[in-house]
Amino acid sequence: MKVLALVYPGMTLLDMVGPVQAWSFLPDYEVQYVWHRPGTVLTDCGLGVQATHSFEDAWTDPDILFVGGGAKPTLDLLSDSVAIGFLADRGSRARWVCSVCTGSLLLGAAGLLRGYRAAVHWGAREALSQFGAEPSSERVCVDRNRLT
């Protein structure tokens, strides 16, 4: 199973670690941590996460595309057309598109939640609806192949 996990400056480490740890128990699990370029990316708590791949050299056909949240850093990333374009491209080919917390906003900006029900931090529900998603108050929302 090939998982692409977006890492970005200021992201909430907990949002990524929980899902990635759970997936690591699956057979044939592989993960690529992606950002503009390989290297250390500092999270919200100051702990560095290693981006193993750039957008250009990441898998084109992941089983799972995953995005965690990060409050203001997530909002800042909404204006990064390269990152949003990467999510749109890989998400259109992924078997599953997944997010935690405000990561749903990034999926929404990439057009990946249009017409889907999706969970997001309660403070971002109105913003999520602007991307054509139907915000859900569920803590975990599954709509077809979208898990938020």
Residue ranges and their predicted role:
Residues V97-C98, A118:
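A short beta-strand/loop micro-motif in the catalytic core of glycosyltransferases
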Residues G70, T102-G103, L112, G123:
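Beta-hairpin (beta-strand-turn-beta-strand) motif
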Residues L113-V140:
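A conserved active-site-flanking secondary-structure segment within enzyme catalytic domains
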Residues M1-V97, S104-G108, E134-S137, C141-D143:
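Extended, subdomain-level signal for the structured scaffold at the beginning of enzyme domains
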Residues N145-T148:
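Conserved anion/nucleotide-ligand pocket segment
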